[in-house]
Swiss-Prot record:
Protein name per its UniProtKB record: Phosphomethylpyrimidine synthase
Keyword Coiled coil: no
Amino-acid positions noted as binding substrate in the UniProt annotation, renumbered to this chain: 94, 123, 162, 184-186, 225-228, 264, 291
Co-factor binding comment: Binds 1 [4Fe-4S] cluster per subunit. The cluster is coordinated with 3 cysteines and an exchangeable S-adenosyl-L-methionine.
Source taxon at top rank: Archaea
Disulphide bridges: none
Length: 424
């Protein structure tokens, strides 16, 4: 099974038909997008999922990352995070646990959702090595590939694979230096392993073998961003660009083998560099779907990073990013709660919509809201709101004497005043 090969043969699959219906585009548009590597549709032969297209000409999608840590590991809490992410309207999930029984947690998360689920196999491989052998640097390459295959068989739909970290990337990082160091967990694991063992990254060195696993299990490959900046002052540096170029070359190779591929982008980017990052990524990857991690546009707002990321995500989407990884208010501070997961998804959905208003001219809901407000039709306003429940709760908690309006204006509602004298 290969959606790319099917599309290139001219076949419109059921998955492509569903995406076309969801997005309001033609089936041929989706087929051509998949055939050209500009659209991916994560699937799995091992579980039925809610079909979701990601890529050029489609609505910007939002991913919610969940998972335990070595300090907090409660699978029931993670399942509640799944529920909250779904309630908030996430398009996909990533299960990124690093504490507890990792395989069992992932199994339970996958069983609890119909959304496409992504993972980072490298985490489990390194953590198992630490538990069984004493250190993450004692991981065996064979174990990394074994775990990758096991996660694929468990029904994982897409995987972040850190292929772009190699000796050349590390040389760029060493020569340039950084203000905030290396903040990607996968990047840190792999860099430490390479330096300790004096070996090339097996995901890069044995990329052909990795592709065989991806092809066999129809997993969508997400080219991981292990060299992403962890501070705006490190944004768009030589190490990040080197990794992007390597990932772009490998993404082309994956596509030629029939493996659907996404390329991940940076996480901390000042506003004036966002457009350049999107243009560069789209150009060097031949317009493959772009997965932005946030991005955060300033580093001084811990506790409010979901709002900071809204700014970056809205701009990224407007310039052409296809996929946004949410950020919660707990970013840089703690493992998020289910409530913070909900807030993070809502924030990212708002940002994605703002971007799509520009990128795809998707403004019908905003037009409907304008009409509903003019008519003082509160039920219509709630229906079109991105979070109807919250909008209704706020108004209901402070109901006006005149139930047509709200307590913001009371008797002096501009809409009601004008309506008495002017019909337009």
């Amino acid at each position: 099974m290969s959606l790319i090969k099917d599309a290139q043969r001219g076949l419109v699959t059921e998955e492509m038909k569903l995406v076309a219906a969801q997005e309001g585009v033609t089936e041929e548009f989706v087929r051509k997008g998949v055939a050209g590597g500009h659209i991916v549709i994560p699937v799995s032969p091992y579980r039925k999922v809610k079909i979701c297209g990601i890529g050029e000409g489609l609505r910007t999608k939002v991913n919610a990352s969940i998972g335990t840590s070595s300090d907090i590991s409660d699978v029931s809490v993670e399942i509640e995070k799944v529920r909250q992410a779904e309630l908030a309207g996430a398009d996909t999930l990533m299960e990124l646990s690093t504490g507890g029984d990792l395989a069992d947690i992932r199994r339970q998360v996958i069983a609890a959702t119909s959304l496409s689920v992504g993972s980072v196999p490298l985490y489990q491989a390194f953590i198992e090595a630490a538990h069984k052998k004493g250190a993450v640097v004692d991981m065996e390459a064979d174990d990394l590939f074994r775990i990758t295959a096991e996660q694929a068989k468990a029904g994982t739909n897409f995987m972040a694979i850190h292929t772009g970290i190699n000796y050349e990337t590390m040389k760029r990082l060493q020569n340039q230096g950084r203000h905030a160091g290396l903040v990607s967990r996968g990047g840190a694991f792999m860099t430490a392993w390479m330096l300790h063992n004096e070996k090339e990254n097996p995901l890069y060195a044995e990329f052909d073998y990795l592709l065989e696993i991806m092809k066999e299990h129809e997993v969508t490959l997400s080219m991981g961003n292990g060299m992403r900046a962890g501070a705006v002052h490190d944004s768009t540096d030589r190490a990040a660009i080197q990794e992007l170029l390597i990932n772009a070359e490998l993404a082309d190779k994956a596509f030629n083998e029939g493996v659907q591929t996404i390329v991940e982008g940076p996480g901390h980017v000042p506003i004036d560099e966002i457009q350049a990052n999107v243009i560069l990524q789209k150009r060097v990857t031949n317009r493959k779907p772009f997965y932005m991690l946030g991005p955060l546009v300033t580093d001084i707002a811990p506790g409010y990073d979901d709002r900071v990321a809204m700014v970056g995500a809205a701009l990224s989407s407007s310039y052409g990013a296809d996929f946004i990884c949410y950020v919660t208010p707990a970013e840089h501070l703690a493992l998020p709660t289910p409530e913070e997961v909900f807030e993070g998804v809502i924030s990212s959905r708002i940002a994605a919509h703002i971007g799509d208003m520009v990128k795809l001219n998707k403004r019908d809901d905003d037009l409907e809201m304008g009409h509903a407000r003019k008519a003082l039709d509160w039920d219509r306003q709630y229906a079109v709101a991105i979070n109807p429940k919250r909008a209704k709760e706020i108004r209901d908690s402070r109901m006006p004497a005149d139930t047509d309006g709200c307590t913001m204006c009371g008797d002096y509602c501009a809409i009601k005043i004008v309506a008495k004298h002017f019909n337009f």
